[in-house]
């Protein structure tokens, strides 16, 4: 069989231990299965083998399409005639069946993926929201989004990037809400990529799609590990990009205001959510400018405005009680936000550093 000979020459059968070639007989015809060990469901393969062993010579149809319809008891089945597609499917974990006398290949998607359970992300926690998060398996991530939007306008287009890795990429959007010009721009940028592989998954894709200028520190994408946040952005007309082997979604377009938003802002009443947004914006600004401004005022005390004179190192000054409460409330909110968004692996070293800094300041 020419097809089997070509597959044996192209694939490293016998060299790669996980690349399996299984020769069987179906209806008194020679047949060969190609698949990757570790990707195949054993139960599904047993059912397929039982079905194949029961096919008689008289029951063999003339074409591969008819055989797939009559004798392949599985849902995801395709008939391929292009060898590039066959090789790509085999290396992706799909089981490919060649039968003597058929010019086409029968691709049976019996894949199963090693994946961790769905759990809440460490750095994007919510007080009142759902407790699920994206994982490294792309089909699980699309299912989490489909569960929340049961609408025919939700489109998920599959493509790939990387000449060697051939990493799966899914472009998600609402066809009745998305900006068509933005969508066309995103598709053209992904299709025009000429890279060997996505070493760092989404970060590599982001850098390849939009070349960042050195003088612009702001990101082009917003990343989230929460399906509810991604779905909310879809309903706003934005585009979501999912990359296989990455537990987060890329959101675009984005702005500076999107970076300070969190899921908690929408799980509380409007007034509370607005307060959280304003507090986060103030804390973000203070994080960037408070240290240099404080140093500037300490070196030039005459520049301190009258309303902030209590910050200067002088004798005892009575700070207005209302101002004390406002500063205390803002500090508590800042600590709460830091506790919610700090990964568990960084919480201990940051606590030690904070204790040393506060102790040195007190002394």
Language-model features and meaning:
Residues 255-363:
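Transmembrane alpha-helical segments that form the functional core of multipass membrane systems
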Residues 1-289, 297, 303-304:
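Membrane-embedded alpha-helical signal segments
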């Amino acid at each position: 069989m020419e097809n089997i000979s070509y597959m044996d020459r192209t694939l490293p059968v016998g060299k790669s231990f996980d690349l399996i070639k299984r020769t069987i007989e179906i209806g008194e015809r020679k047949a060969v299965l190609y698949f990757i060990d570790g990707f195949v469901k054993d139960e599904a393969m047993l059912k397929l083998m039982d079905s194949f062993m029961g096919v008689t010579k008289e029951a063999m149809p003339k074409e591969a399409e008819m055989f797939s319809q009559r004798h392949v008891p599985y849902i995801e089945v395709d008939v391929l005639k292009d060898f590039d597609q066959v090789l790509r499917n085999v290396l992706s974990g799909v089981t490919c069946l060649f039968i003597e006398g058929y010019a086409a290949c029968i691709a049976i998607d019996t894949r199963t993926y090693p994946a961790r359970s769905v759990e809440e992300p460490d750095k994007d926690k919510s007080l009142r929201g759902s407790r699920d998060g994206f994982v490294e398996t792309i089909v699980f991530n699309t299912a989490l989004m489909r569960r929340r939007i049961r609408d025919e306008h939700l489109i998920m287009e599959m493509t790939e990037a990387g000449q060697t890795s051939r990493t799966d990429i899914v472009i998600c959007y609402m066809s009745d809400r998305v900006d068509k010009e933005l969508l066309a721009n995103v598709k053209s940028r992904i299709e025009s990529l000429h890279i060997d592989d996505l070493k760092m998954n989404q970060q590599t894709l982001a850098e390849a799609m939009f070349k960042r200028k050195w003088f612009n520190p702001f990101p082009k994408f917003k990343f989230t590990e929460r399906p509810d946040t991604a779905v909310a952005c879809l309903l706003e007309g934005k585009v979501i990009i999912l990359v296989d082997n990455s537990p987060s979604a890329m959101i675009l377009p984005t702005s500076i205001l999107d970076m300070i938003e969190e899921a908690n802002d929408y799980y509380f009443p409007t007034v509370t959510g607005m307060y959280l947004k304003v507090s986060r914006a103030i804390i973000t600004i203070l994080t960037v400018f408070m240290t240099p401004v404080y140093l500037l005022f300490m070196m030039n005390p005459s520049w301190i405005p009258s309303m902030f004179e209590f910050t200067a190192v002088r004798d005892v000054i009575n700070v207005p009680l209302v101002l004390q409460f406002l500063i205390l409330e803002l500090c508590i909110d800042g600590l709460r936000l830091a506790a919610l968004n700090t990964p568990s692996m960084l919480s201990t070293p940051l606590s030690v550093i904070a204790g040393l800094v506060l102790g040195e300041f007190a002394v």
